[in-house]
Amino acid sequence: MDFTFNEEQTLIQDQVDQFIQKEYDWETRQSLSNSDLGFGNDNWQKFAELGWLGISTSEESGGFGGSAIESMLIMEAFGKGLVVEPFLETIIMCGGLLDEHGTDQQKSSILESAIAGQMHLAMAYAEPQSRFNLSDVVTEAKADGDSSIINGYKSVVMNGPSANKFIV
């Protein structure tokens, strides 16, 4: 088996590594994590401009159609740099779910806005009583005309404070 990266993957890896080395030093990270937002919106916009926010989203949903390898390369560099921007929450978790299971309307409004760096997403899935059992769900959603009424509690919603939209 050949585990070498192709030319495009190597370019992505180099680009993200260079960004972290040049623009994400420890002092910058500390300043961002201590800000009201908890991360840098300017960085989020750079990530969008560089195409990183759409790299793993299918072309049909407005992304670049990359694979898990491209996402892994970005996540690895972000891990090394202790990046605080909500890439995992907005792009990998919520974006991946919308890409695979969202309606065309959700993809065109929510997912494309997230890829453009204009929206932050959060997934509200954990419940206080469930601990690590994701099938222990008490929260209920009931149809009410064209909308739904949700009753229940969610806990530890990563990126909740800065999210524009939630997936429950």
What are the functions of these language-model segments?
Residues 117-125:
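A short, Trp-centered hydrophobic/proline-enriched beta-strand micro-motif
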Residues 139-142:
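A structural signal for short hydrophobic beta-strand segments in well-ordered beta-sheet cores
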Residues 27-49:
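Short secondary-structure junction/hinge motifs that connect adjacent elements
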Residues 147, 151-168:
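A short core secondary-structure module
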Residues 49-108, 112-117, 159-163:
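Internal helix-loop-helix
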Residues 9, 20, 51, 58, ...:
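Buried hydrophobic positions in well-ordered alpha/beta secondary-structure cores of metabolic enzymes
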Residues 1-8:
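Intrinsic disorder at enzyme termini
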Residues 2, 13-17, 42, 69, ...:
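Glycine-rich phosphate/cofactor-binding loops in nucleotide/flavin-utilizing enzymes
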